[in-house]
């Protein structure tokens, strides 16, 4: 396909591991982007227990726009840095094996980068579940009560934000701050955007940029993800204490208050009965989750709606426990 040299070249970059379920669809949607300039895709492949590496090689053999590089550690920031190093263009658009670009996404991020002069431009994560549990997760991830008030989750007006989903970067802005910090195996996007903003650059949220994301679809996988995310958020806050906010402290406070309430209540069973009032703390929290989850899920199908309170509780408690353990 011929390209228009008046348009800047774009390198889409991503890192994958155990993504055989989504990789082909993700890559095909990226390559189907209607962008007039040169477009390449660089995929860093980590050690996988499924057919991810074979599928990536097949895609590279079929499509000359696809380049595959190794990510021996399998860790996300290492893979992203390896893909960026192999990319040939100065506009870098991040992709993800669980995410799907809508038509025109690349052209729009290039336009917004040029119009705003920002170092990074991104939009909303639009989670879509493939089963009842994942649909409940998708709802929780879009709810201020579920995951907090970040614009890329819940929406908002265009303008500077602390972080955005995925993002489209100017290479010079990433190189100026040293790329992704490979210490942060989770939360590396937020941490990178923090350093970009600290360097005097702008991270721009554009609500019209919406990327579909497939969330975890089992309780175990979702709880594990939230536990590790909470732990790594604490590590980010330890390195960047100025980033501390009540939104990040709320889940660990809920965990602490609930555990303390249960312990005090159990002491009351054997000593002073009035201490049993401590049990009211976790009970009030669970009642609140049930009520809010039920009303927030009014637009879900019945199986997903029934699961939403559980998903919200797992999200809060797993995230908070991970934060406290500093996983």
Model regions and ranges:
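Cell-envelope/extracellular polymer assembly enzymes that use nucleotide-activated donors
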Residues: 8-11, 40, 191
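Short, acidic, metal-binding catalytic loop of nucleotide-sugar glycosyltransferases
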Residues: 28-38
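A conserved acidic beta->alpha catalytic loop
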Residues: 45-54, 73, 96-102
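Glycine-rich, basic loop-to-helix element that forms the pyrophosphate-binding segment
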Residues: 70-87, 108, 164
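Short aromatic/hydrophobic "clamp" motif used to bind/position activated sugar donors
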Residues: 92
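Catalytic donor/gating beta->alpha subdomain of glycosyltransferases that bind UDP-sugars
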Residues: 181-244
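Membrane-embedded multi-pass helical conduit in multi-pass membrane proteins
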Residues: 254-327
């Amino acid at each position: 396909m011929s390209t228009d040299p008046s348009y800047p070249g774009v390198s889409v970059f991503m890192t994958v591991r155990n993504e055989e379920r989504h990789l082909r669809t993700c890559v095909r949607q990226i390559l189907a982007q209607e962008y007039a300039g040169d477009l390449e895709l660089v995929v860093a492949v980590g050690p996988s227990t499924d057919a991810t590496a074979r599928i990536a090689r097949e895609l590279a053999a079929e499509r000359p726009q696809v380049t595959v590089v190794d990510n021996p550690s399998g860790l996300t920031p290492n893979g992203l840095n390896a893909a960026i190093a192999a990319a040939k263009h100065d506009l870098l658009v991040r992709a993800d094996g669980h995410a799907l670009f809508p038509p025109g996404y690349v052209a729009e991020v290039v336009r917004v980068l040029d119009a705003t002069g920002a170092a990074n431009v991104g939009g909303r994560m639009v989670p879509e579940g493939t089963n009842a549990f994942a649909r409940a997760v998708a709802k929780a991830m879009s709810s201020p009560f579920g995951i907090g008030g970040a614009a890329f989750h819940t929406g908002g007006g265009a303008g500077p934000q602390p972080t955005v989903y995925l993002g489209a970067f100017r290479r010079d802005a990433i190189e100026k701050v040293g790329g992704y910090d490979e210490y942060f195996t989770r939360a590396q996007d937020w941490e990178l955007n923090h350093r970009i903003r600290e360097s005097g650059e702008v991270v721009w949220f554009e609500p019209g940029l919406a990327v579909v994301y497939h969330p975890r679809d089992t309780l175990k996988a979702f709880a594990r993800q939230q536990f590790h995310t909470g732990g790594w958020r604490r590590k980010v806050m330890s390195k960047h204490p100025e980033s501390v906010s009540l939104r990040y402290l709320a889940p660990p406070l809920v965990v602490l208050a609930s555990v303390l309430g249960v312990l005090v209540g159990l002491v009351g069973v054997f000593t002073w009965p009035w201490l049993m009032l401590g049990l009211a703390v976790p009970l009030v929290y669970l009642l609140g989750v049930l009520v809010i989850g039920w009303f927030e899920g009014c637009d879900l199908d019945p199986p997903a709606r029934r699961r939403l309170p559980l998903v919200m509780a797992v999200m809060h408690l797993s995230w908070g426990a991970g934060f406290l353990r500093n996983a």
